[in-house]
């Protein structure tokens, strides 16, 4: 049996950030993931300058040999009506490919890594957690996304009782013919809101790569909404006529609608495993990074790994992201005051789509980069 101070399950942005943050803590850390890296990852894939700053990533250095698409404009509309385009002037976000971004973050981790290793068992034994009958630690951190096996240890775990966002998307490298037929521009992601405001679709070009997808909180209608959106985008020339391959599905919880416990004795959840995606946009990368850094701060200071000692992590999450709603409302993307028929007019407004939808809901420009002492 190999002993560690903590085991991190999941080597995505949350897990790799936590491992890196604990590098000089003196703790022996193991990070486990079911896949090898680099690996395919379904995600629209954009990160704000705040994320780059928090992770100390130099955009110029990162862009060498990797896709990094500067974003200066957004094109936003409601399905079935004309879009509004806003120019923000400066670079307000970056497009990345998750297969590259996640591999880059993991490459900066110097702790032991056990990749291509599915977690088949997690057993409590003498105050420690034993994973796959091979590795043992007093603390296990779930960073494995929505269906993280560690999340099953807390509360009711992942399941049908949760109100999840279901998304389908595809990302592919365009041929020269496809690229010339695609009106979507790299520096201008397109966001298209469903008319019932229970989701939105996107068209995001990153150099020669194109990402198209749609996410909703009622997945039984997801395929129909997606097919209608794709046909509309094809008919207007926003995307090429010939799309390769199948759309891939994934799921996640919005912060205000999630009810997962964040800690228990010897257990913590971070990132999508904890249900931290921003409620208005569904973005999970920044909450994943920040939750990992907040967790590292608590782990570094904790005298033991009891639930009471780890509860300060839950308090820090509430302080950073707000208190979760006790009764989740029925709307997904938007507050109650933005409802039809008002929404149709608001989505035609340059001020609203720029100041509220883009800068507040999607870019979170009013929230400064996280500063923690780890």
What is the predicted role of each segment?
Residues 7, 20-43:
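Glycine-rich FAD pyrophosphate-binding loop
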Residues 11, 21, 107-239, 275:
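Predominantly flavin-linked oxidoreductase catalytic cores and closely associated redox partners
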Residues 36-75:
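N-terminal FAD cofactor-binding segment of flavoenzymes
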Residues 118-121, 218-295:
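FAD/FMN-dependent oxidoreductases across multiple families
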């Amino acid at each position: 049996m190999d002993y560690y101070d903590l085991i991190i399950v999941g080597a995505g942005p949350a897990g790799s950030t936590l491992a890196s943050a604990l590098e000089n803590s003196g703790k022996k850390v193991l990070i486990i993931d079911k896949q090898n890296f680099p690996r395919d990852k379904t995600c629209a894939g954009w990160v704000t300058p705040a994320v780059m700053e928090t992770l100390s990533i130099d955009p110029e250095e990162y862009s060498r040999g990797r896709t990094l698409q500067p974003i200066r404009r957004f094109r936003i509309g409601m399905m079935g009506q004309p879009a509004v385009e806003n120019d923000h002037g400066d670079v307000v976000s970056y497009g990345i490919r998750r297969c590259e971004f996640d591999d880059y973050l993991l490459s900066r981790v110097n702790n032991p890594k056990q990749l291509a290793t599915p977690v088949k068992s997690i057993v409590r034994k003498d105050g420690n957690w034993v994973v796959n009958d091979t590795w043992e630690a007093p603390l296990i951190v779930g960073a494995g996304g929505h269906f993280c096996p560690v999340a099953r240890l807390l509360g009711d775990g992942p399941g049908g009782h949760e109100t999840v966002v279901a998304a389908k998307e595809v990302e592919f490298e365009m041929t020269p013919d496809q690229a010339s037929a695609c009106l979507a521009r790299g520096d201008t992601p397109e966001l298209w809101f469903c008319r019932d405001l229970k989701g939105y679709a996107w068209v995001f070009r990153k150099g020669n790569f194109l990402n198209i997808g749609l996410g909703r909180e009622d997945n039984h209608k997801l395929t129909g909404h997606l097919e209608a959106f794709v046909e509309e985008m094809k008919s207007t020339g926003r995307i090429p006529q010939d799309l390769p391959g199948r759309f891939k599905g994934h799921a996640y919880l919005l912060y205000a609608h999630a009810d997962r416990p964040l800690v228990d004795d010897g257990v913590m959840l971070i990132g999508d495993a904890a249900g931290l995606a921003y409620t208005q946009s569904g973005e999970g990368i920044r909450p994943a990074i920040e939750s990992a850094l907040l967790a590292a701060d608590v782990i570094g200071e904790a005298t033991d790994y009891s639930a009471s000692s780890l509860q300060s992590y839950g308090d820090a999450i509430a302080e950073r992201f707000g208190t979760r709603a006790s009764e989740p409302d029925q709307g997904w993307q938007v507050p109650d005051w933005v409802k039809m028929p008002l929404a149709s007019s608001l989505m035609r407004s340059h001020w609203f789509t720029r100041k509220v939808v883009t800068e507040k809901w999607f870019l979170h420009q009013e929230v400064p980069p996280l500063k923690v002492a780890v």
